[in-house]
A protein has these predicted regions:
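Conserved active-site alpha-helix within GNAT-family acetyltransferase domains
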Residues: 55, 79-95
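Conserved acetyl-CoA pyrophosphate-binding loop and the N-cap/start of the following alpha-helix
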Residues: 48, 52-61
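Residues that form or flank phosphate/diphosphate-binding pockets in enzymes
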Residues: 39, 52, 82
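GNAT-family acyltransferases
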Residues: 1-47, 63-64, 68-71, 75, ...
């Protein structure tokens, strides 16, 4: 998998395309959430769901947060139980609500 930085929509990209073996499989979200945290997330094509990509991307994004010495936040749409499951699986804990989403913060 590879981040395609050139696909960014601003000077400091917020959304990156993701590919595997040359095929587009979705996007990752990676941007400042506040001064101390980055928001991470993913939007994957339905035909790649259940193959572990979300977990792989989550690990990669957590590593990027650590390089920046920042925490990680995942905002979960309450209708997406899988997102909540992945957040909890990787050590995120519920920390509140924002704009109708459940907010999970990585506990280190």
């Amino acid at each position: 998998m590879q981040f395609l930085v050139d696909a960014g929509l601003s000077e400091k990209p917020l959304v990156y395309a993701v590919e595997d073996s040359g095929s587009f499989i979705g996007y990752v979200i990676f941007h400042d959430y506040d001064e101390e945290n980055m928001e991470i997330g993913w939007i994957l094509k339905r035909d790649v769901w259940g193959r572990g990509y979300a977990s792989i991307l989550t690990k990669m994004l957590i590593a990027e947060c650590r390089k920046l010495r920042k925490g990680a936040i995942i905002e979960c749409d309450p209708r997406q139980a899988v997102t909540e499951h992945i957040a909890k699986k990787h050590g995120f804990k519920f920390s509140g609500k924002r704009d109708g989403c459940d907010v999970y913060k990585l506990e280190e």
